[in-house]
Amino acid sequence: MTDNAILLGEGFTLMFLGMGFVLVFLLLLIFAIRGMSLAVNRLFSEPPAAPKPAPAAVAPADDFARLKPAIVAAIHHHRRLHP
């Protein structure tokens, strides 16, 4: 083998070793963060929120009674502008 082939082989070896160490480090980091998240959630859990009372339902007739004059005025305005 020539010196270039040996250097290329060592370069690939170092590259794969470096990539392997980075991969292992990132996987350990992921598991450590997940573990810390579980620990924090277990130690400092939020109290359950009290259910909010449901708003009273408004009668649809009441809504229509309030909107009817506005609808009539809008139709009248439209018909006046576009004969």
Swiss-Prot record:
Q: Where in the cell is it found?
A: Cell membrane
Q: Which domain of life does the UniProt lineage start with? A: Bacteria
Membrane topology note: Single-pass membrane protein
Q: Which GO terms describe its biological process?
A: sodium ion export across plasma membrane
Molecular function terms, GO-annotated:
decarboxylation-driven active transmembrane transporter activity; oxaloacetate decarboxylase activity; sodium ion transmembrane transporter activity
The record lists the catalysed reaction(s) as: oxaloacetate + 2 Na(+)(in) + H(+) = pyruvate + 2 Na(+)(out) + CO2
GO cellular component annotations, sorted alphabetically?
Answer: plasma membrane
Enumerate the cofactors the protein uses: Na(+)
InterPro entries, alphabetized: Na_pump_deCOase (IPR005899), OadG (IPR023424)
EC number(s) recorded for this UniProt protein: 7.2.4.2
> What residue ranges are annotated as transmembrane?
13-33
Which keywords does UniProt give here?
Cell membrane, Ion transport, Membrane, Sodium, Sodium transport, Translocase, Transmembrane, Transmembrane helix, Transport
- One short Pfam name that applies is OAD_gamma
Function, in words? Catalyzes the decarboxylation of oxaloacetate coupled to Na(+) translocation.
Subunit comment for this entry? Heterotrimer of an alpha, a beta and a gamma subunit.
The UniProt entry's sequence similarity note says:
Belongs to the OadG family.
Name the UniProt record assigns to this protein: Probable oxaloacetate decarboxylase gamma chain
Organism (species):
Klebsiella pneumoniae subsp. pneumoniae (strain ATCC 700721 / MGH 78578)
